[in-house]
């Protein structure tokens, strides 16, 4: 408890500005060189705590266009006979027909959920006829949409320009809002059209119908004195409110998971930039507390209270393995996903010795978005002994941490540091890991391509830590074959250039004049250029192979302080555009303005 009291005292002194600061130097937050651009837009025009804006005016969301029935020549068949579907049933049939041939349509859960929801949209007489998905034939529907997609690819330049102009007009009308007198870009002004839910991993609700969102489902948020957005003709909004403590412009509840969806500002907006900056500053502040927190939970492994022991072991997993705390679910929710606090005995196996290590814990469970988390990791002996204790006399379905809840853990984290959550730990460890990996992997003398490979390898370590997986892209094999073909062709060019250089060197040795010297230099430069191109292709192939099942983007955009990457780019003379796309650079404009080459997290 002494450490907890010290942490509370330190937090209070920090709020009062009484904690002595170390001298500003390389790698210390607060250094002027690492905090350049203090007059940035996201630091100006501050409101009191909780207030996000004074003025918010916008046009509301853009709704998906109404369904256009299929042409008469495109038919649906049941038991080999054409069946004329009602408009509602036909629309849902097109959702499945579009996906014909996709892996999803081979999954039993997807097929079952789709068919159940589709039958709900059918007329009574249609349900009496269509009783089995196996007897349905969507071939003509599928071919119709394949042909439409092919036709779009061969549009004339004029037709493509017209479509571009229409999209730009839509962007101008719905894609911007006025926030405190400034025009700000909106992130996702289009409401998602109806379709079939896919989910990530083996989601139990895959195939269910995502219903069409209507204006009557949508809550509008804007300032009281602004012009309220006009709903589409013949409709009205569910509600119009003025809540300046939130940053969303419109909200509705989607039909599959009953989760709330929002129209938000673009990530490059002032408010989003400020929120991101504060998020990473909170994680960065953890650096001053983390050693004491770790000492505390290690001491708590020996606590007399079972609740305290369980909390300490859970916090160790959150810290070391970047596990999510796990949100409590409503009774009856279909997806059996868990986090650290809701782990069951069946999700953990203990091995006294495995893989040449002692005290190994094997995790196997479905995490967020039904992504499987599997890991075998050696742990400290007291953690292993405590896990044995927690599992005594429990069945497979019993909670591992039966004295712990997400709520109680979060309350404890707040006591350790103001603003501390499991996600802050995750962000802190992800960012620290990236910084350490970049320091270990990057060599100043490497080529740009080799440095980028080092960066992606560092990013990959973080993605694995955070369990950011993806399925191998369906185009992977083909793209790798194309890349290997390019590499082979480049090798042949290098061999030919090397032979030409040898001949040029022999001619210069024989003639010794200026002309032969010029030819020799030209051949040498050509060989160097081709060798560099070959090296870049080889690095690209290695990078593609290593990351085929790892999603680098999730951690890069959400858990890694962008100032680390920008500082690395500046320090090693790597163009920032090699790491961040144009859209991402706009998103992290605040970091580009703040981070010098000596910034450290």
Swiss-Prot record:
GO biological process: DNA replication; DNA topological change
Pfam family, any one: Topoisom_I_N
Region annotated Interaction with DNA, chain positions: 261-262, 324-329, 421-423
EC number: 5.6.2.1
InterPro entries for the chain: DNA_brk_join_enz, DNA_topo_DNA_db_N_dom1, DNA_topo_DNA_db_N_dom2, TopoI, TopoI_C_dom, TopoI_cat_a-hlx-sub_euk, TopoI_cat_a/b-sub_euk, TopoI_cat_euk
Keywords associated with the record: DNA-binding, Isomerase, Mitochondrion, Topoisomerase, Transit peptide
Record's GO cellular component terms: chromosome; mitochondrial nucleoid; nucleus
Any one GO molecular function term: DNA binding
Keyword Isomerase applies: yes
SUPFAM superfamilies in UniProt: DNA breaking-rejoining enzymes, Eukaryotic DNA topoisomerase I, dispensable insert domain, Eukaryotic DNA topoisomerase I, N-terminal DNA-binding fragment
Site (Interaction with DNA): 152, 200, 248, 279, 337, 368, 410, 468, 486
Active-site residues, as the UniProt record annotates them: 559
Transit peptide: 1-50
Keyword presence, Oxidoreductase: no
Free-text cofactor note: Divalent metal ions (calcium or magnesium).
Region (Disordered): 22-48
Catalysed transformations (reactions): ATP-independent breakage of single-stranded DNA, followed by passage and rejoining
PANTHER family in the cross-refs: DNA TOPOISOMERASE I (PTHR10290), DNA TOPOISOMERASE I, MITOCHONDRIAL (PTHR10290:SF1)
Entry protein name: DNA topoisomerase I, mitochondrial
Species the sequence originates in: Pan troglodytes (Chimpanzee)
């Amino acid at each position: 408890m002494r450490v907890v009291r010290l942490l509370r005292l330190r937090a209070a002194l920090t709020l009062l500005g009484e904690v002595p600061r170390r001298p500003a130097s390389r790698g210390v937050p607060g250094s002027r060189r690492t905090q350049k651009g203090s007059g940035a837009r996201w630091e100006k025009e501050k409101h009191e705590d909780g207030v996000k804006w004074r003025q918010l005016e916008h046009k509301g969301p853009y709704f998906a266009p109404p369904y256009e029935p299929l042409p008469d020549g495109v038919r649906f068949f049941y038991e080999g006979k054409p069946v004329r579907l009602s408009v509602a049933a036909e629309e849902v049939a097109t959702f499945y027909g579009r996906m014909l041939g996709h892996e999803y349509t081979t999954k039993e859960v997807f097929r079952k959920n789709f068919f159940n929801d589709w039958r709900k949209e059918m007329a009574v007489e249609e349900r009496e006829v269509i009783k089995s998905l196996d007897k349905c034939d969507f071939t003509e529907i599928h071919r119709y949409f394949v042909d439409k997609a092919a036709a779009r690819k061969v549009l004339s330049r004029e037709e493509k320009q017209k479509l571009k102009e229409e999209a730009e007009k839509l962007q101008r009308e719905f894609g911007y809002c006025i926030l405190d007198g400034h025009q700000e870009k909106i992130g996702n002004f289009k409401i998602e059209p109806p379709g079939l839910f896919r989910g990530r991993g083996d989601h139990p609700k895959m195939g269910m119908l995502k219903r069409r969102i209507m204006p009557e489902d949508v809550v509008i948020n804007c300032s009281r004195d602004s012009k309220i957005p006009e709903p589409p003709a013949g409709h009205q909004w569910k509600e119009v409110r003025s809540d300046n403590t939130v940053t969303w412009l419109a909200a509705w509840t989607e039909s599959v998971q009953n989760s709330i969806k929002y129209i938000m500002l673009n990530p490059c907006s002032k408010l989003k930039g400020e929120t991101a900056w504060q998020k990473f500053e909170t994680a960065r502040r953890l650096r001053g507390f983390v050693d004491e927190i770790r000492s505390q939970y290690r001491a708590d492994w020996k606590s007399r209270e079972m609740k305290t022991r369980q909390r300490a072991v859970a916090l160790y997993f959150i810290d070391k393995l970047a596990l999510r705390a796990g949100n409590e679910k409503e009774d009856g929710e279909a997806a059996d996903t868990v986090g650290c606090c809701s782990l069951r005995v069946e999700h953990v196996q203990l091995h006294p010795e495995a893989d040449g290590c002692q005290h190994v814990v094997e995790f196997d469970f479905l995490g967020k978005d039904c992504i499987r988390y599997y890991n075998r990791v050696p742990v400290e002996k007291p953690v292993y002994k405590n896990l044995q204790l927690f599992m005594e006399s429990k069945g497979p379905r019993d909670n591992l941490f039966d004295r712990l809840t997400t709520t109680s853990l979060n309350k404890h984290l707040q006591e350790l540091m103001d603003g501390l959550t499991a996600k802050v730990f995750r962000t802190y460890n992800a960012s620290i890991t990236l910084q350490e990996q970049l320091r270990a992997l990057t060599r100043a003398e490497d080529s740009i391509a080799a440095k980028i490979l080092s960066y992606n390898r560092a990013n990959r370590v973080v993605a694995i830590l955070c369990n950011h997986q993806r399925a191998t892209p369906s185009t992977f094999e083909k793209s790798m074959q194309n890349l290997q073909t390019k590499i082979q062709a480049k090798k042949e060019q290098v061999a030919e250039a090397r032979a030409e250089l040898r001949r040029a060197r022999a001619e210069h040795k024989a003639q010794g004049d200026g002309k032969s010297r010029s030819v020799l230099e030209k051949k040498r430069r050509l060989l160097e250029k081709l060798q560099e191109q070959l090296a870049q292709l080889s690095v690209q192939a290695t990078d593609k192979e290593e990351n085929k099942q790892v999603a680098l983007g999730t951690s890069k955009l959400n858990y890694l302080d962008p100032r680390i990457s920008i500082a690395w780019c500046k320090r090693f003379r790597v163009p920032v555009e090699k790491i961040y796309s144009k859209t991402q650079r706009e998103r992290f404009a605040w970091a580009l303005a703040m981070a010098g080459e000596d910034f450290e997290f």
